[in-house]
From Swiss-Prot:
This protein's name: NADH-ubiquinone oxidoreductase chain 1
Catalytic activity of the protein: a ubiquinone + NADH + 5 H(+)(in) = a ubiquinol + NAD(+) + 4 H(+)(out)
Species in which this protein is naturally found: Pisaster ochraceus (Ochre sea star)
Location within or outside the cell: Mitochondrion inner membrane
Superkingdom of source: Eukaryota
Length: 324
């Protein structure tokens, strides 16, 4: 019976994630269209609402072709692993009932997000293409570089909240959000999440010019590409939801009023997602050396300095140290 309940719980959060990804693809094209003074998708269904279904059907019916010199197993295993890790991250978020809700959930999220680089590198290497391999190396270097800054920012959040549990971190922000109290920390976190999810202006791994078109997914056919695509957009929604829980107080100021607290979380997440799209429509792509310069010479020293500064300020409060 417990296995059946666990299976139903898993399906209960997988289906909404897939629906949210489909809706995000439509919202992205609509928002970018209106920002560029055009309508976006408006043919398939009323007002283009069925466009995600048409896109998914198109990818599914495409023939799955494998390059003749590609690795026979890793070529198909990498997209599945990337999709599985992306969906597994959602089981930790305690929105209603978390499948894996425990005290060290922050560490688990950081570890699972780090594992995705293996699927990206494996996908680039297994296709036996120089362009795909270079795109995979770029993706790995970018992800690892910005994860260091994200890890230091998470340590600062832990210092403020006194624990590694996501529910605890959200509950301590009832009076003041960390995004307000520590705005420099939140700004570094938000920009780093753009780089972590390979979004503009940090989407160098999927450059649309001749430098590395589609990057590691250059030779990926329709079905496996759909897994990469779904996982990438699921990561975008997840990182914004994670930002809401860490810095915007989750469902506060109505944490105890169900379902208003869920609506509050969804509203904040959608606002951050639209901000992602707004940045994509407004800013040009960084050069790769500028991307690395930003994280290693700007964000890493700044996030480390803020961590030491916040720890020093809180160490002056002896009552806090006793509770901690």
């Amino acid at each position: 019976m417990s296995v059946i309940l666990l299976l139903l719980n898993s399906i209960g959060f997988i289906v909404p994630v897939l629906l949210a990804v489909a809706l995000l693809t439509l919202i992205e094209r609509k928002v970018l269209g209106y920002m560029q003074l055009r309508k976006g998708p408006n043919i398939v269904g009323p007002y283009g609402l069925l466009q995600p279904i048409a896109d998914g059907f198109k990818l599914i019916i495409k023939e799955t072709l494998k390059p003749s010199n590609a690795s026979p197993y890793l070529f198909y295993l990498s997209p599945v692993l990337f999709f599985f890790l992306s969906i597994l991250l959602w089981s930790i978020i305690p929105v209603i009932n978390s499948t894996l809700n425990f005290n060290l959930s922050l560490i688990l999220i950081l570890g699972l997000s780090s594992l995705s680089v293996y699927s990206l590198l494996g996908s680039g290497w297994s296709s036996n293409s120089n362009y795909s391999f270079l795109g995979g190396v770029r993706a790995v270097a970018q992800t690892i570089s910005y994860e260091i800054s994200l890890g230091l920012i998470l340590l600062s959040v832990v210092v403020f909240s006194g624990g590694f549990n996501i529910g605890l971190i959200s509950s301590v922000q009832n009076e003041c959000w960390l995004a307000v109290c520590c705005f420099p920390l939140f700004s570094i976190w938000f920009i780093s999440t753009l780089a972590e999810t390979n979004r503009a202006p940090f989407d160098l791994t999927e450059g649309e010019s001749s430098n590395s078109f589609q990057g590691t997914m250059l030779n990926i056919p329709g079905g496996p590409f759909a897994l990469f695509f779904i996982a990438e957009y699921a990561n975008i929604i997840f990182m914004n939801l994670f930002s809401v829980l860490l810095f915007l107080g989750g469902g506060s100021p109505v944490n105890l009023l169900f379902p208003i607290n869920i609506i509050s979380v969804i509203f904040k997440t959608v606002a951050l997602v639209v901000l992602f799209l707004w940045i994509r429509a407004s800013y040009p792509r960084f050069r790769y050396d500028q991307l690395m310069y930003l994280t290693w010479k700007k964000y890493l020293p700044l996030s480390l300095g803020l961590l030491i500064f916040f720890k020093f300020l809180l160490s002056l409060n002896k009552d806090y140290l006793q509770d901690y």
